[in-house]
Every structure is written in C-alpha cells, then in structure tokens.
Amino acid sequence: MAQAYDAGGAGGGDNRTKDLIATVSAIANSLMNEVGKVIIGKQENLRRVTVGILSNGNMLLEDFPGLGKTMLSNTFAKALGCKFKRVQFTPDLLPSDIMGTYMYDQKTGEFKLRAGPLFCNILLADEINRAPPKTQAALLEAMEEKQVTIEGITHKLPAPFVVLATQNPIEQEGTYPLPEAQMDRFLIKMSMGYPDRSEEKAILARRKLRGKDDHDVLQITSPKKVVAMQKALETVHVDPAILSYVVEIVQRSREDHRIINGCSPRASQNLFKSSRAAAAIDGRDYVIPDDIKSIALQICSHRIVMKPEAKIRGITGMHIMRKILSEVPVPVIQPA
C-alpha cells in the first residue's frame, strides 16, 4: 500500500524560506532556458545538469563523439558566469598535467604554483576512460575533496567546482573502464543521445539564422550566487516518509540476486540532496516522491554491478532500477 504523509507539514517553511527557494527556482529556470537556446531538444538533460550543479555533484556523460557534450558544458559555464576548462584525456596524460606543478621563478628565487586546468569552476574531462588509472584517480580525488595536493601542499579548488566527465562506450578500442569505486563518485550518469529529425533540422536552422558557428550566451548568474543557491537547498524540507522511500529504493538495489554490488550509502545521500535540488527548481520548499523518481535512474543505475551471467543476458543496472521504482510503494501526498 502507498504510504501517506502530510504535505502541509512538509511544505510548512516560513516566508523567508519560500522566498529563497523562489529565487533559486527563477535563476535555475532562466539558466535552463538560456542553455536551451543552444542545446536543442535535450530539456531533461539540461534539468539533470542543473540538478547536479545545485547539488554540487559531478556528472558522467557516456556518448559517442560529436553529440554536444563540450557545447553543453561550455554553455552552462557561460550562463553561470563560471570559469571553464576542458582537458582531453589521453593515455600519456600525467596527474601533474591536470593538477599543476611548482616552477622555479628566477626573478624572485622562489617556487611558484603553475596551476593546472583543475583550477576552474566547470571542468570538462573529455574521454576520461582514455587516461591511465593514475590520472583518473587524481581527477576523482579532486572531485571528491574539492582540493588537490601538489608536492605536499594542499590547495582548495574554486567554488563551485563541478566536473562533467565524458567517456566513450567501453567496447571502443583504447579505453580504460572506470573502476566501480570511481563510478560511485559520480552523482549522475547520463547520455545525450542523437537528436531526432526535427531537432537536427532545428539545429541547422538556428545555425543558418546565426550566421556564425559561435553562440551568444547571456550570463544568468555568478559563481558566488551558485554557491549561495547550493547552500539554500538545506532549507528544503524532506519528510521522514520520503527518507524511508529513499532507503527502501537503495536497500532493494542490494537484494537482487542478479547483482554483485548494489547502491552504496553514497547513493542514498545523493538521492537525498538531489531531490532537494529538483524540488527547488520546481519552486517547492519540500520534496515529493516525484522528485526522487525523476532522478533515481541517473543517480543509482551506474552504481550497480551485475553478475557476469546477467550481463550476458543484457541486464543492466537501469533494468534493476526500473523494476525497483515500479515496485516500491510511493508515499502519497495528502493535503493538510
């Protein structure tokens, strides 16, 4: 049976909280609208990236080349007013190439930090699965800790610091699959996918109208405001019934006989904070079950490790999560 909880109590924040979330919603939707002028027909993915940024999480995009991953990242960075860097990962890329190193300054007689591309707000880590494991580990440590250690000295990375990593499908030649422990550090995994006929025609029509390859993108907000919006999510109410719903989803991912590993506690924490972001985008200061369902597949599926026999049959973490979401009783909102 569906479990009921009191939506009135869930949404019972004070006026200051409601105003704060209304501001977050307005900025987030303006951001998606601005990016949507460049990225055609991918509204669900724009929302997922916005959820990821508000949740201060990192995202993994698995796609073939040419599907707009760089444009997506760069456009978001411009609209956010954030510093953007792109690193093309290759088999010979070293950790120091992305973190930076100390160089001797002959004028001052001192060693000075030559910061690498990690020192930015939005980093596109392109084809991360072409880099050797040591360099992958250096990036993933920066993602988790929001800091890097260079020659024994720890440096905080700028805030916000969000990584959009891309990887080619693992069957492609010359790739190093990310270990399960590292996959778990990505808040969201998603795919851009090919545009359909109408979307691709719209892309060409807009290119013709622009008269140039580049896109003009308005700055919607600033890094300082992004950090403030991330902090504002702490005011979004999460009812105990919603917490139980999250726990049940994650627990069931560990119980299926076809899996080796299910979702970790990090998955439940990520569902928790991302549901707050989803609620805020919709202008609510409380979470509803649909907020969980809207992001659970992208947050949980990549964390599930299937048994070999299940892989052979074509069963994936996405199949497991769809089954779980269809079976777990959903809390029903009842007006106060």
Predicted regions and their residues:
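Conserved AAA+/SF3 P-loop NTPase catalytic/coupling segment centered on the Walker-B
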Residues: S96, P117-E144, P158, E173-M183, ...
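Conserved alpha-helical scaffold flanking the Walker A/P-loop in AAA+ ATPase domains
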Residues: R47-V51, Y104-L124
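C-terminal engagement/docking regions of AAA+ P-loop ATPases
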Residues: A2-K18, E255-A336
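Conserved catalytic/switch belt of AAA+ P-loop NTPases
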Residues: G52, K134-K156, V162-L164, N168
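Pre-Walker A (pre-P-loop) alpha-helix and adjacent loop at the N terminus of AAA/AAA+ ATPase modules
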Residues: L20-L67, V247
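Conserved AAA+ ATPase core "coupling" helix
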Residues: P95, M99, T175-E248
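AAA+/SF3 P-loop NTPase mechanochemical coupling elements
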Residues: K112-N121, I150-Q167, L178-I188, R266
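Walker A/P-loop
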Residues: I53-T90
